[in-house]
Amino acid sequence: GYDFENDRDFTSVEQFASELNDWLSTRGYRNLYAVYGCSMGGSIALMVTLEQRIKINHCIMDGGITPYQLPWFVTRFIALKDYLMMMLGRVGGISLLEKAFATDEYSKEDLQYVVDVLRHCSRKTLWRTFDSCNNYRVPEPVSDINTQIHYWCAKNEEKERKQDIAYMKRKFPQTEFTKLPDLG
């Protein structure tokens, strides 16, 4: 969905994690020191870990997104809002991104890359990104894992990640939390 050299649509966090585990397994990986993911990548890292097809010592979620704990119809409205914002960014280009988001820490080249990615992605990929990332299914009950989970969060995004942190504390009490200095 996001790869300029592959026009496949993104499907879901769960499927991407499963395909990543397949890829690693077919190449002979049986043990990884760590998996790392930022934001949506944190969701994928967690799901790769929870499948337990490969022994993983550390799962690092850097501001990782956890499933919403809201009624299904509410999550649809949130996904729709996020999707429409991305579609506006896709149509409006850099000038709209600069107006809609805090872009002080990004160069024109960075912003152009974001626009290029948004324009490359299909509408289906963009919708599925928000729908899946906010609603992926963590196994219930969570089976015991021998992986140390780490949740990193920048000090200035702590409020934004409050629900994710609470979810991780509730579902994965063994998680080690690290507050990073003012970043991201």
Model-derived segments and spans:
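Conserved alpha/beta-hydrolase catalytic His-Asp/Glu region
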Residues: 70-72, 90-143
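Conserved alpha/beta-hydrolase "acid-adjacent" motif
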Residues: 158-164
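Short beta-strand immediately N-terminal to the catalytic nucleophile in serine-hydrolase-like folds
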Residues: 35-37, 62
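Flexible "cap/lid" loop of the alpha/beta hydrolase fold
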Residues: 50, 56-86
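Short beta-strand/loop motif that positions the catalytic acidic residue
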Residues: 145, 151-153
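Active-site loop/oxyanion-hole signature of alpha/beta-hydrolase fold enzymes
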Residues: 1-34
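Catalytic histidine neighborhood in serine/cysteine hydrolases
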Residues: 165, 169-184
